[in-house]
Amino acid sequence: SVTITSYDVSSVKKDDAIAALLPESVTKDGKLTIGTNPSYAPAEFLDADGKTQIGYDMDLARAMGNIFGLDTEIVSSNFDTIIPAIGSKYDLGIAAFTITKERMESVDFVSYFTAGMGYAVAAGNPKNVDENDLCGLNVAVETGTVEEEAINKTAKQCKADGKKDITIQSSKQQTDATTAVVTGKADVFFADSPVVGYAIAQTDGQLEQLGKDFDEVPNAIAIKKGDSQTTEAVQKAMQKLMDD
C-alpha cells in the first residue's frame, strides 16, 4: 500500500514580521486553532493511532503555526460545520476547501493549490458506470462538498430528462463514501482528484478511476470574513513556505 509521509515542519521557524500582522483575537490564547475533517486523505486523515491528524493540509497548518509563533491546535469536526464556526471556534479552516461563491459569502479565502474532481468505481467497472450518464445509479459523496452540490444538480437533470433517479448517498466522512463503493453499496464515488487517487492506492486494487480528472479549482484556507489582518498574515506565511 502507498503511505504518504508527512513532512517534518520543526525546521519552520517564527517570522516576527509575519506574526506581528495577526490580530489579538487570534494570538491572545497562544494557539492557532484549526478546524478540519480528518476523513479526506491524503489532505487530512488520522494516523494509525486513530488520534493524530496527518496529511498535507495538517503539515501546512502546523508550519503556519510555527511561522506565527503559536501552538497549532487542530480540531476535528464534521466538514459542513467548519465554515460556520470560523472566527468563533476556529481561527482558520483547513480542510481541502474549494472556493465557491456560496462559501465566499461566509468566509475569506487564501488559496494554496489546485485540485480537480474525479470518480472512482469498483475495479473492472463491473456495473459499466459511464461518467457521462449517472442517472439510475447510487452515487456516494461526502456531505457539504462541492461534489455533493454537483451531483444534486446532475440528479435534477436526470429527473428533468425523464431518466431514472440518482440515489445520492451522502456521508459525514469521505472514508464511508469510499467503503460504500468497495462493498458494492454504491456504484461510484465522487471526490477531489487527490482523494480519488489516494483511495485507489489504499484499497489495493479494489477501486479504479473512472474517466479523467476535471474542473480544476483552487483549494483554499478559510478565514473569518472581513478579517484582513489574518488574511494578510496567512498569505505572507503561504508565500514564505512556498519560497523556502
Residue ranges and their predicted role:
Residues V2-D16, N66, N125, L137-N138, ...:
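Extended ligand-binding regions for polar small-molecule ligands
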